[in-house]
Amino acid sequence: MAEQTETSTAGYNYVSYGTEQHPIAGLSRVVRHITGHDSEGRSVFLSTDIGDHHRTLGEKQAISNIIYSTNQTPVELNGNHDIEFARNTEPGLHVKDGSVARLIDFAPGVESPLHRAVSLDYGVVIEGVFKMVLDSGEERIMRPGDISVQRATAHKWINVTGNGTLPGRMLFVLLDCNDVYVNGKKMEGYLGTLAKDYEGRSS
């Protein structure tokens, strides 16, 4: 079992497993299957792998696996343009006019900083139990199969699996959206201490 050490930094509370491996120790291996067509128009598997882009977030308290990303709507599938983009581009938090499917493994007890993505986000609990907290103070407990629909709202995630003693996993699908206004005030995105994890990446 990977070494566990108590760690604390601004904006985060977590137990670090002290590893950058994917998946995080204690979670199942993830396999991605991409399909397409052969020369006769039959459906075929083009690849089976574990994804193109993996990144440790923060101080090893979470690991991101980009399942797929696109940069236009509708998506151009002809000529495998979408596959080339997904393979060659590690996206930012979200992609303008596009989409990002991101799997995140959370170490035990991780609490993310409060943040807002100006996008439409679907969050699905795959393994574990999570608490979703909004900037209003409202919160919900989410279990495997539960889904959140974040409409450019400020929130944070807390991995409460096993009362904070076990890792957990969520899938996030982020879609670009128009600017959002509330009573004439534009809702601005902010990432807090997450910002450094997305610097210099395509968005």
Curated annotation (Swiss-Prot):
Keyword tags: Oxidoreductase
Keyword Zinc listed: no
EC number: 1.-.-.-
CDD domains with a match to the protein in the record: cupin_BLL6423-like
Alphabetized InterPro entries for the sequence: OryJ/VirC-like (IPR047142), RmlC-like_jellyroll (IPR014710), RmlC_Cupin_sf (IPR011051)
Consequence of gene loss (knockout): Impairs the production of flavoglaucin and congeners.
Annotated spans, Cupin-like domain: 105-171
Pathway(s) served: Secondary metabolite biosynthesis
Entry GO MF terms: oxidoreductase activity
Function: The PKS fogA releases the carboxylic acid (8E,10E,12E)-3,5,7-trihydroxytetradeca-8,10,12-trienoic acid as its product, as well as derivatives with one and two double bonds.
Family: Belongs to the virC family.
Name by which UniProt lists this protein: Cupin-domain-containing oxidoreductase fogC
UniProt organism field: Aspergillus ruber (strain CBS 135680)
